[in-house]
C-alpha cells in the first residue's frame, strides 16, 4: 500500500506530463528543513528577519528551525521617501581624517538604519570609550541642491543620555545609535522651548506612533472622546503626552521570557501616516461597505426565515470588556492607539455570560479552526488579533458573536440561533452608526473595521452567499494604497486572510473574486512585499525557512502563479458574458462552469490569451511542484529525519495513519496542501487556458496525481481534520474531470470522511459531480455554480 501512494517518477505518463510543463532549466531550488534561509527581494539577499521577542513556535518547521531569534532578523523598514527631506540630499562619504570633528564616530545615514536594529553591546567605561567603536574615517555630510556642504543642524531634541555625555545624538527612536552601541538606557525628554523648530513629517509620524498609547489610557473615556480633525491640535496633544512619558519602559514578556522593550526593534511602529494615505472617500467607502454588508445579511436572514418577521429581536446586554491591565505577553503590532495584541488568548479571559459565551466558544473553535486549521489546538495569531481588538471594539465583538450564532444555526437549524444572529448584527450596526460619525474615529479604528468587514465576508462565504464581492471594494482600495514599506502587522495579517478568500473565489466561482484590474492583482499578490513577509514571519504565520504560509496552505511565492492565472481567467470571464441569459439567469452552455474552456467559450478569448504568457505560467508551476517541505509525495519515508519516530515532534504538519493492510505511514500536510493547490491551478491552465479536452491523457494524469495524495484514506481510522480544506477545490476539479470509477471512488470517500465540517458545501459539490459523471438533471443554473469551494 505504501508503494501505491507514490507515483513512479519514471513512468511514461509522467514523462508525457513533463512535456506540457517547462523544459529543464535553472529553477528555484526548494528550501530544505536543515538549510538556512534568507529573504530575497529584487535579487538582493539579506539576512533580515530576526525578532528579539521569544514568541512560542507554532509550527513543525519552526520547531525544527529552533529559536526564531537565530533564524531571521525582524527589522523595521522605512519608506525610501524619507531619505530625501526638504530637498536636501544625504550622502555618505569616506574621509581619511581620523575624526577630530563632531561627526567622528557617528554612523552614516545607511549605517543608522542598520545599526539601529542591530545594536552592538560592548564594554564601555564611564567616559564612553569602547573597544568596538565605528570607523572614525566614515563621516556623513549634508549637501544642498548645488552640491555645497551645509552645516548640520544642532541636535536640540537628543536623548538625555547623549546630552549628559555631551555627545551628538542621532535622535533615533526608540533607542539612539550611541545608547544602543553602549547598551545605555535611552530616554527622550521633549523640551517645550524647541517646539518652534520644525521637524520632518516622517519624524512627527514616528513620534506619534511611538507614544500614541499614552493618549487613551482610560478606555471608557476614549470611547466618549470626540477626535478633533485639526492636525495642529492633535500634534499639540501628542507633545503634551510625550512630555510626561519619561518613565522607564517596562519589559514585555511572553510565556515568562523577559524581553526588554528597548531591545525589541521589531516592535517599531511601521512608517504610515493614515491622514495622507486615506482620504474622505476611502473612509466613507469602507464604512458604506460595512454598513451594506450587515444590512444585506439581515435582509437575507429575514427573507429566508419568515418566522423572524413577527418576532422582536432580543435586547442583548453585552458587557463592556476592558483590555487587561497586565502588559505581560502583549506586543504592540499596530500603528494606532491602544492596539496591543495579547498572544495565546484564553477563552476564559472573556466573561460575557449567558448565551454570549456559547457563541464565542463556537467562534473560538469551529470558526477559527476552519479559517486557520494549521493552528488548531495551538497558538493562533489571527485569533489573538481578533479577540484582542474585540475587547476594545464592541462592534467587532458583536460581529464575532454573530458569526458564532450563524454557525450554530447551520448546525442545529434552531430559529433561536438565527434570531440572536440578527440581534447581534443589529447591535453591530447601531454601534457603527454611533462611533463613526466622525471621520477621525474611523481612522483611529481602521484595523478592527477592516477585520470586521473581512470576517462578515467570510461568513457570507461560509453560508454560501455569493453577494460578498461588492462589499470588499473599500478594503481592496486600502490594501492597494497601504503596501510595501508602510503597513502594519495587523493589516498584513488581514491582507493574508483576504488573499485566502480571493484565491479560492477566483478559481472556483463563475464570477471570480473581487479583484478585476491587473494592477490591483500585482499590488496585492506580491510575494516580494518585504514588510508583508516580515510581519507574517514575526507572527509565526509563515515558516522562516521555507516560507510556507500556514494561513494560506502553500508557499508564499506561489502568488507568482496565482496572479497570472487570475489575469487570464478575468479575460475569459469578460468574454463569457455573452453566454449568460439576463432574462432567465441560465447558463446557455449545458456544461459545468469549471469544465468550460477558452476554446469552447468564445473566439475572442482565444485571441486575447497569450500562449507565451501561459507558457511562463507553466514554467513557474513546474518550479512550485518541485518544492519540498518534508517530502513532496505527501508520505514521509520512515528514514526521513522529520519522521515522528525519529524527530519525536508531534505537530499539525504531520499525521500518522494506519492503513487497512496494517502499514503505518506518516503524511505531510504541508506538502499535500501545497502540491494539490498547485496541481489544481495546473488543471485550470490546461483546461481553461489551453483548452485541452478532459479525455486527454495529460488531464487524466494530473487528475490521478491529485487523488494519489489521498490514498491514505484507505484506512479504518483516517485522519479527520480541517487541514483538508486547502485541497477541497483540487478534489472537486479532479473529480469533475475523472473518467475512471477508481478515481471517482476516492473522490466520494474523500467527501464522506471530510464533508462533515462543510456539510452544505459537500452536498452541493457532490450534486455537481453526479451531474457531470452520470448526466443526472443537467440543468446548470448560474447561481448554483457561483459558490466558493473552500
From Swiss-Prot:
Disordered, as annotated region: 1-50, 72-157, 195-258
Location of the protein in the cell: Nucleus
GO CC, any one term: nucleus
Keywords, ordered alphabetically: Activator, Amino-acid biosynthesis, DNA-binding, Lysine biosynthesis, Metal-binding, Nucleus, Transcription, Transcription regulation, Zinc
Superkingdom as given in the UniProt entry: Eukaryota
Compositionally skewed regions (Low complexity) per UniProt: 35-47
Bias (Polar residues) ranges: 75-113, 120-142
Portion annotated as DNA-binding: 159-186
GO molecular function: DNA-binding transcription factor activity; DNA-binding transcription factor activity, RNA polymerase II-specific; RNA polymerase II cis-regulatory region sequence-specific DNA binding; sequence-specific DNA binding; transcription cis-regulatory region binding; zinc ion binding
Annotated Basic residues bias: 222-239
Record-level GO BP terms: lysine biosynthetic process; positive regulation of lysine biosynthetic process via alpha-aminoadipate and saccharopine; positive regulation of transcription by RNA polymerase II
Role: Activates the transcription of lysine biosynthesis genes. This activation is dependent on the inducer alpha-aminoadipate semialdehyde and repressed by lysine.
Additional record remark: Present with 450 molecules/cell in log phase SD medium.
Identification of the protein by name: Lysine biosynthesis regulatory protein LYS14
Amino acid at each position: 500500500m505504501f508503494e501505491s501512494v507514490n507515483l513512479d517518477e519514471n513512468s511514461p505518463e509522467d514523462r508525457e506530463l513533463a512535456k506540457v510543463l517547462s523544459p529543464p532549466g535553472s529553477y528555484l531550488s526548494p528550501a530544505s528543513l536543515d538549510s538556512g534561509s534568507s529573504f530575497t527581494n529584487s535579487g538582493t539577499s539579506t539576512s533580515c528577519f530576526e525578532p528579539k521577542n521569544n514568541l512560542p513556535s507554532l509550527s513543525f518547521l519552526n520547531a525544527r528551525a529552533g529559536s526564531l531569534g537565530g533564524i531571521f532578523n525582524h527589522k523595521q523598514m522605512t519608506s525610501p521617501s524619507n531619505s530625501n527631506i526638504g530637498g536636501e540630499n544625504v550622502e555618505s562619504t569616506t574621509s581619511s581624517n581620523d575624526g577630530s570633528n563632531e561627526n567622528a564616530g557617528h554612523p552614516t545615514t545607511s549605517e543608522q538604519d542598520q545599526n539601529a536594529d542591530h545594536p552592538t553591546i560592548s564594554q564601555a567605561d564611564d567616559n564612553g570609550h569602547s573597544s568596538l567603536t565605528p570607523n572614525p574615517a566614515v563621516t556623513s555630510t549634508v549637501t544642498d541642491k548645488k552640491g555645497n556642504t551645509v552645516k548640520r543642524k544642532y541636535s536640540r531634541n537628543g536623548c538625555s543620555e547623549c546630552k549628559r555625555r555631551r555627545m551628538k545624538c542621532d535622535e533615533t527612536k526608540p533607542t539612539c545609535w550611541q545608547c544602543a552601541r553602549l547598551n545605555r538606557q535611552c530616554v527622550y525628554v521633549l523640551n517645550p522651548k524647541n517646539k518652534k523648530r520644525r521637524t520632518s513629517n516622517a519624524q512627527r509620524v514616528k513620534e506619534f506612533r511611538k507614544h500614541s498609547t499614552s493618549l487613551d489610557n482610560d478606555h471608557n473615556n476614549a470611547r466618549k472622546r470626540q477626535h478633533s480633525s485639526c492636525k495642529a491640535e492633535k500634534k499639540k496633544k501628542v507633545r503634551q503626552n510625550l512630555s510626561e512619558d519619561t518613565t522607564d519602559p517596562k519589559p514585555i514578556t511572553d510565556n515568562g521570557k523577559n524581553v526588554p522593550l528597548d531591545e525589541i526593534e521589531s516592535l517599531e511602529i511601521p512608517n504610515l501616516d493614515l491622514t495622507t494615505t486615506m482620504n474622505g472617500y476611502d473612509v466613507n467607502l469602507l464604512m458604506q461597505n460595512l454598513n451594506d454588508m450587515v444590512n444585506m445579511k439581515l435582509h437575507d436572514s429575514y427573507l429566508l426565515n419568515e418566522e423572524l418577521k413577527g418576532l422582536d429581536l432580543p435586547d442583548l446586554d453585552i458587557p463592556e470588556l476592558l483590555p487587561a491591565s497586565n502588559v505581560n505577553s502583549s506586543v504592540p503590532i499596530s500603528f494606532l492607539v491602544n492596539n496591543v495584541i495579547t498572544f495565546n488568548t484564553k477563552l476564559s479571559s472573556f466573561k460575557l455570560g449567558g448565551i454570549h459565551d456559547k457563541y464565542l466558544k463556537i467562534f473560538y473553535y469551529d470558526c477559527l479552526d476552519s479559517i486557520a486549521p494549521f493552528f488548531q489546538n495551538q497558538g493562533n495569531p489571527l485569533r489573538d488579533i481578533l479577540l484582542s481588538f474585540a475587547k476594545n471594539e464592541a462592534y467587532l465583538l458583536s460581529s464575532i458573536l454573530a458569526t458564532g450564532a450563524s454557525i450554530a444555526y447551520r448546525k442545529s437549524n434552531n430559529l433561536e440561533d438565527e434570531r440572536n444572529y440578527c440581534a447581534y448584527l443589529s447591535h453591530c450596526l447601531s454601534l457603527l452608526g454611533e462611533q463613526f460619525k466622525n471621520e477621525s474615529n474611523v481612522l483611529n479604528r481602521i484595523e478592527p473595521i477592516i477585520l470586521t468587514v473581512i470576517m462578515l465576508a467570510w461568513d457570507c462565504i461560509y453560508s454560501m452567499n455569493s453577494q460578498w464581492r461588492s462589499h470588499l471594494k473599500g478594503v481592496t482600495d486600502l490594501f492597494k494604497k497601504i503596501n510595501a514599506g508602510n503597513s502594519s502587522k495587523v493589516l498584513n495579517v488581514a491582507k493574508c486572510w483576504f488573499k485566502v478568500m480571493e484565491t479560492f473565489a477566483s478559481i472556483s466561482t463563475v464570477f471570480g473574486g473581487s479583484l478585476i484590474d491587473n494592477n490591483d492583482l500585482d499590488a496585492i499578490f506580491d510575494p516580494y512585499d518585504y514588510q508583508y513577509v516580515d510581519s507574517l514571519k514575526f507572527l509565526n504565520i509563515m515558516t522562516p525557512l521555507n516560507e510556507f504560509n500556514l494561513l494560506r496552505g502553500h508557499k508564499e511565492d506561489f502568488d507568482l502563479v496565482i496572479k497570472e492565472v487570475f489575469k487570464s481567467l478575468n479575460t475569459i470571464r469578460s468574454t463569457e458574458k455573452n453566454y449568460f441569459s439576463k432574462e432567465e439567469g441560465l447558463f446557455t452552455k449545458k456544461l459545468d462552469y469549471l469544465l468550460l474552456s477558452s476554446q469552447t467559450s468564445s473566439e475572442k478569448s482565444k485571441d486575447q490569451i497569450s500562449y507565451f504568457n501561459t507558457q511562463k505560467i507553466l514554467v513557474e508551476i513546474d518550479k512550485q511542484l518541485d518544492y519540498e517541505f518534508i517530502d513532496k509525495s505527501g508520505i514521509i519515508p520512515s528514514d526521513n529525519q522529520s519522521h515522528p519516530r525519529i524527530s519525536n515532534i508531534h505537530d499539525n504538519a504531520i499525521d500518522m495513519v494506519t492503513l487497512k493492510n496494517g502499514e503505518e505511514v506518516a503524511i505531510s500536510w504541508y506538502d499535500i496542501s501545497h502540491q494539490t493547490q498547485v496541481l489544481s491551478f495546473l488543471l485550470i491552465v490546461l483546461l481553461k487556458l489551453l483548452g485541452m479536452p478532459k479525455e486527454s491523457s495529460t488531464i487524466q494524469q494530473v487528475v490521478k496525481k491529485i487523488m494519489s495524495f489521498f490514498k491514505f484514506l484507505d484506512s479504518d481510522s483516517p485522519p479527520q481534520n480541517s487541514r483538508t480544506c486547502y485541497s477541497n477545490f483540487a478534489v472537486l476539479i479532479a473529480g469533475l474531470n475523472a473518467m475512471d470509477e477508481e478515481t471517482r471512488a476516492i473522490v466520494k470517500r474523500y467527501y464522506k470522511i471530510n464533508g462533515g465540517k462543510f456539510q452544505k458545501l459537500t452536498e452541493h459539490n457532490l450534486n455537481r459531480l453526479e451531474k457531470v459523471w452520470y448526466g443526472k438533471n443537467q440543468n446548470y443554473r448560474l447561481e448554483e455554480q457561483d459558490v466558493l469551494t473552500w
